[in-house]
Amino acid sequence: TPTRRQRQMCIRDREKAGYKAGKEIFLALDSAASSFFKDGKYEFRKSGGGVKNSSEMLSFYQDLCVKYPICSIEDPMDENDWEGFASVTESLGGQVQIVGDDLFVTNTEFVKRGIKESSANAVLIKLNQIGTVSETVATIEMCRKAGWNYVISHRSGETEDTFMADFAVAMGGGQIKTCLLYTSPSPRDQLQ
């Protein structure tokens, strides 16, 4: 499938540049599973992968983690599939960062539930998603207390201001998610 070819090309190209997959190069996936979740199933029809339930999705991710040096999977299940998220985290969370974005929407109540149910081990933090800096910092503090990672992220349609890069450094999480250099009209966050 195109996605499989893209993963293979990504690894191959980095290895040609002298980096070793699984040592210096890792892949982080944003599955956005809610976007292909229909009527209680995950639909892969466009790529020829058929339809999968939550346990088949878990097997799919387990297989990917064996084949590729994956370090992080964002939104591996639908935003309402808390059980599915927990099963992925139980199976892969010891070796891979399982990030909740749509599951948590930077909301402390959802993160609290996720911590209680072991639904992930990391949260995507979008400052303008929850509304205030203080609410965002409270969510980050909750992650820290639980021993979870957090990834500061932009949201599509944001300005070219570099605040998000500065905020990521100030919060000390060590991770930021920004748009790709070649898709951004101005890649200031990456250059900051």
Residues covered by each model-derived region:
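Catalytic core of soluble alpha/beta enzymes
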Residues: R14-S184, R188
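Single conserved hydrophobic/aromatic residue that forms the stacking wall/gate
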Residues: T1-R7, I11, Y182-Q192
